[in-house]
């Protein structure tokens, strides 16, 4: 995970997931989690990106 992807993920978690994994279920789930609260979306975004 590069420096700019980390910065983008911190600022806008769904965008970080979109850039890392593309448009799919992980992106949709991250949007929902971010709408429920910033912290759950942020945790999910980092989890999705470091899963590989």
Curated annotation (Swiss-Prot):
Q: Which UniProt keywords apply?
A: Cell membrane, Membrane, Transmembrane, Transmembrane helix
**Which cellular compartments is it found in?**
Cell membrane
Record GO cellular component, one term: plasma membrane
InterPro entries, from UniProt?
PMP3
**Keyword Transit peptide annotated:** no
What's the protein's topology in the membrane? Answer: Multi-pass membrane protein
Listed under GO biological process in this entry are: response to antibiotic
Q: Which residues cross the membrane?
A: 1-21, 23-43
UniProt record similarity statement: Belongs to the UPF0057 (PMP3) family.
PANTHER family named among the record's database cross-references: HYDROPHOBIC PROTEIN RCI2 LOW TEMPERATURE AND SALT RESPONSIVE PROTEIN LTI6 -RELATED (PTHR21659), UPF0057 MEMBRANE PROTEIN ZK632.10-RELATED (PTHR21659:SF42)
Name the record gives this protein: UPF0057 membrane protein YqaE
Which source organism?
Escherichia coli (strain K12)
Q: Give the gene that encodes this protein.
A: yqaE
